């Protein structure tokens, strides 16, 4: 039997006091993923986290651990459902009756990076506190995911000349591990899974800046994301056909992002090529860093990206609306509102 890591033992101690009383009528939202969905777990695991410093949070007056100028996608989804924002799982003072956020900046599906909760750690944390909710609540709750970007960005940095076969093998490895974690959540009662698929990662301002591609996207990173998204779709469809009660949706974030990048003015953006906060050729590095003098745009709603890899609040709000109520050309096989009321 695999021995628990020291990091997870420490996490276990943090979670022991969190079995809180709940309302029998509560609606639950469980958030898994990385910094796109992290609303404050990272500061419990590391010091001087940029998202806890200005100008993060400037649209809501203060930094709060979110990697944006304001609210992130799960915040808006919670608002649409009429429930409180799902608090960070590592906040021992929080009330988890309406759900919880396991997502943590730097999280991956594979590997064991330091000072984060991998997807495996997040699922273990859910297993540890699952009795916080009744069986019925866990079955009716929504399990939201944005995960995998760090796996492919790390792979790109280390394997810039990877062959097609090597790329395919790595994507298969990532999806196989992700499937294992979904099966674990299903075994813990999860039935309704909502995925925001991966962005065209090669088009992130930080990637363009790091790899000096100018206004062009880095093909390898975006190709890996596209392969991941295709295999994810096939895997979820297979699980829905083989597991009783397994339901899912996928928001096509990849193509939705490309549409915004192709016609920024149609979406009210000045630019989708540069970040609002940061330094460098694309203003993509250093936002919130103590010892970096970053540029800050004067109107963050004119930017798709707040920093080099995270969306501005305006973009997050638009994404949340699409996840919640768009038609099947954007979110399929149903939208989140339909999934929530699905038997």
Swiss-Prot record:
Pfam families documented for this protein: Lipase_GDSL
Location of this chain's protein in the cell: Secreted
Gene Ontology MF term list: lipase activity
Signal peptide residues on this chain, from the entry's feature table: 1-26
Gene Ontology biological-process annotations: endoplasmic reticulum organization; lipid catabolic process
EC number: 3.1.1.-
Keyword terms, alphabetized: Glycoprotein, Hydrolase, Lipid degradation, Lipid metabolism, Secreted, Signal
Tree of life domain: Eukaryota
pH sensitivity of activity: Optimum pH is 8-9.
GO (cellular component) term, any one: extracellular region
Chief place of localization: secreted
Keyword Glycoprotein: yes
Glycosylated sites: 95, 154, 161, 238, 255
Gene3D superfamilies: SGNH hydrolase
Active site as annotated: 35, 307, 310
Enzymatic class: hydrolase
Similarity comment text for this entry: Belongs to the 'GDSL' lipolytic enzyme family.
Protein purpose: Has lipolytic activity towards triacylglycerols, vinyl esters and phospholipid. Of the triacylglycerols, the highest activity is towards tributyrin.
Name listed for the protein in its UniProt record: GDSL esterase/lipase
Protein source organism: Carica papaya
Record lineage: Eukaryota, Viridiplantae, Streptophyta, Embryophyta, Tracheophyta
């Amino acid at each position: 039997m695999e021995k628990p890591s020291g990091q997870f033992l420490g996490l276990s101690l943090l979670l022991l006091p969190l079995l809180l009383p709940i309302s029998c009528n509560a609606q639950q939202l469980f958030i898994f993923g990385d910094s796109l969905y992290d609303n404050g777990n990272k500061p419990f695991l590391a010091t001087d986290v940029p998202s806890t410093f200005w100008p993060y949070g400037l649209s809501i007056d203060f930094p709060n651990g979110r990697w944006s100028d304001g609210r992130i996608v799960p915040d808006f989804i919670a608002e649409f459902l009429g429930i409180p924002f799902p608090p960070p799982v590592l906040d021992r003072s929080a009330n988890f009756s309406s759900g919880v956020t396991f997502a943590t900046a730097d999280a991956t599906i594979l590997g064991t990076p330091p000072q984060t909760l991998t997807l495996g750690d997040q699922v273990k944390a859910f297993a540890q506190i699952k009795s916080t909710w009744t069986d019925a609540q866990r079955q009716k709750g929504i399990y939201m995911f944005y995960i995998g970007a760090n796996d492919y960005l790390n792979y790109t940095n280390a394997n810039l000349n990877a062959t097609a076969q090597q790329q395919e093998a790595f994507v298969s490895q990532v999806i196989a591990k992700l499937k294992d974690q979904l099966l674990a959540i299903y075994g813990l009662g999860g039935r309704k899974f909502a995925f925001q698929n991966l962005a065209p990662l090669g088009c992130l301002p930080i990637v363009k800046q790091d790899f000096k591609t100018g206004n062009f996207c880095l093909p390898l990173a975006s190709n890996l994301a596209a392969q991941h998204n295709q295999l994810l779709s096939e895997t979820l469809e297979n699980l829905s056909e083989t597991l009783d009660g397994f339901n899912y949706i996928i928001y096509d974030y990849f193509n939705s992002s490309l549409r915004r990048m192709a016609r920024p003015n149609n979406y009210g953006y000045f630019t989708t090529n540069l970040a609002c906060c940061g330094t460098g050729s694309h203003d993509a590095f250093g936002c919130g860093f103590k010892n970096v003098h970053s540029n800050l745009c004067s109107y963050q709603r004119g930017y798709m990206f707040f920093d080099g890899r995270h969306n501005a609040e305006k973009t997050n709000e638009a994404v949340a609306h699409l996840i919640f109520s768009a038609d099947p050309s954007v979110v399929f096989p149903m939208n989140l509102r339909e999934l929530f009321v699905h038997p």
